[in-house]
Regions:
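N-terminal accessory segments that target, anchor, or regulate ATP-driven/P-loop NTPase machines
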Residues: 1-81, 86, 91, 98, ...
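Pre-Walker A (pre-P-loop) alpha-helix and adjacent loop at the N terminus of AAA/AAA+ ATPase modules
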Residues: 81-141, 160
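The conserved phosphate-sensing helix
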Residues: 97, 310-335
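Walker A/P-loop
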Residues: 126-171, 195-198
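C-terminal engagement/docking regions of AAA+ P-loop ATPases
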Residues: 127, 332-377
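Canonical AAA+ ATPase core
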Residues: 156, 211-217, 227-282, 291
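Conserved C-terminal "switch" segment of AAA+ ATPases
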Residues: 165-170, 255-258, 264-265, 270-313, ...
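Short glycine-rich substrate-engagement loop in P-loop NTPases that contacts/grips substrate
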Residues: 170-200
Length: 377
């Protein structure tokens, strides 16, 4: 999308003190490696005026406006360039249009330091130990979606973005499930959960299938101990911990958020990953084939994925399993053939791979009427 307001560029002159403070840098040097005389360098002030509606808009700014020591922007261009790599990876993920649109709000909010108290000094902003003396807002995030839709990868990319922006001080990303947080005896669960939280300070704690921590009737004492410990940490470490939870929306609401009334308000940022269409599944399968260095001898048929979509309820995860089975089918078909026949996937390989894929009893049941895809009734 092109901006309705073009970028505005003006040149300014800095006073001598500001000049040498800004340009104590190897990028702009004069004789003997010193900054050039003040009168020789004009500082260009560039104002970026455009509407940001999606990740692509941010990437366009990066592509059109390089970071330079003699250019001053009205936005944090250095931070935007630092996060461009994870932004491109997120933008390149198949589907997820709603998430890609709305995650921009979270990024530009924190990039502008709007989460920081107005009276915070530069030193307290940079101090990872400042804790709640600085931050007004939570980073904690929810990603709704079924298995196999890329929630873990999205969580990793969001964590990388916050780390590169400097909001998080570490690149730490730890994925956990119920067994990593809940112990076998009462009293031990709080300690185990607290230890995991401590390990993740400065980075991201990602709880996959977080609904498994609780239950709808709230009778699990171990779960309550874990969730209460987690809920307290969400506030105590607001400034240096991002917790991301993921799972089915209904299950998370019934079994996780319903377990403690304080949880809901601490997870400000929420995103939905929609179910993949047959066309998107075909694109995911093709990408996985190419990413592993194989080729498609026969073009993929959209109608084939439409006809078998009911088997692929775990979406991207199923495409990975299907490819593994198709590779096995391929190895049998080309046994004894010349090297130029290898790693060229045919439709016959895909068909045989599907036969192997649906031989699993759990996969067979996916086409049966009334089969539930969630863990809880």
């Amino acid at each position: 999308m092109k901006s309705s307001n073009p970028s505005l560029t003006t040149c300014i002159r800095l006073n001598e003190a500001d000049f040498y403070a800004r340009f104590d840098s190897p990028h702009i040097v004069g004789p003997q490696g010193k900054p050039p005389p003040l009168h020789q360098v004009a500082i260009e002030r560039v104002t970026i005026c455009c509407e940001i509606t999606c990740i692509s808009d941010l990437l366009r700014i990066v592509d059109e406006h390089p970071v330079a020591e003699n250019v001053e922007y009205n936005i944090n261009m250095k931070a935007l360039h630092r996060i461009s790599e994870p932004l491109r990876k997120l933008d390149a993920m198949i589907g997820m249009e709603s998430l890609k649109e709305h995650v921009v709000d979270q990024i530009i909010y924190f990039m502008q330091d709007l989460h920081v108290k107005a009276d915070a000094t530069p030193n307290t902003k940079a101090d990872a130990k400042a804790e709640n003396g600085v931050f007004n807002d939570y980073m904690h995030t929810v990603i709704y979606g079924p298995p196999g839709t890329g929630k873990t990868e999205v969580a990793q990319l969001i964590g990388a973005i916050f780390s590169r922006m400097g909001v998080l001080k570490k690149t730490k990303f730890k994925k956990v499930t119920r067994s990593d947080l809940i112990a076998g005896y009462l009293g031990q669960t709080a300690i185990k959960t607290a230890d995991v939280i401590k390990e993740c300070l400065g980075g991201v704690l990602f709880i996959d299938e977080a609904y498994a921590l609780g239950n709808a009737d709230k009778r699990d004492s171990f779960s309550k101990e874990c969730i209460d410990t987690l809920c307290e940490a969400l506030s105590d470490h607001k400034s240096n911990l991002m917790v991301i939870v993921a799972g089915y929306e209904k299950d998370l609401n019934d079994c996780f958020f319903n377990a403690n009334p304080g949880l809901n308000s601490r997870f400000t940022w929420r995103y939905n990953i929609d179910n993949y269409t047959p066309e998107q599944l075909a694109k995911i399968y093709e990408k996985k084939v190419l990413d592993c260095g194989w080729t498609l001898k026969d073009p993929l048929r959209l109608d084939w994925f439409q006809n078998h979509a009911d088997y692929f309820t775990c979406y991207g995860r199923d495409m990975e399993t299907l490819l593994a089975r198709a590779k096995i089918a391929h190895s049998r078909r080309i046994f004894g053939s010349s090297d130029d026949k290898k790693r060229q996937m045919t439709h016959a390989d895909l068909e045989r791979g599907l036969t192997m894929f649906i031989s699993n009893d759990e996969v067979k049941r996916r086409k049966e009427p009334g089969v539930l895809t969630t863990m809880y009734l």
